[in-house]
Amino acid sequence: MELLDAATMNCLDGYQGQVFDHKPMLFFEYHGTGNEVEQVLDTLPGALEDFGSCNFQSATTQEDINALWKARHDAFWAVKAQYPGLDVIATDVCVPVSNLAGIVEETAGDIVELG
């Protein structure tokens, strides 16, 4: 699972012709048998909607998968383009899924506080 926060999505909107809402975006990658992947694709949209998700996209062909992941792969460069001359630091965090919303809110607050 990968998360791009709202600030990053703002930078990605319009970068390389891509169009995005300025909202956090989660990326999930699943591997398994056709049946296992189908079960995830049947379950995940409803679970995400229960927590306020407003858009779910999935892909099963390599071309469509690459198109969905393009935003994740372009994130660093989109931020660099939005803020030329500034150093960009990409970080990872590992938290239980149950704490994900809290860490996103806390980090967003840190970004606002630190400018």
Identify the residue ranges that each predicted region occupies.
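C-terminal substrate-recognition/cap domain of FAD-linked oxidoreductases
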Residues: 1-115
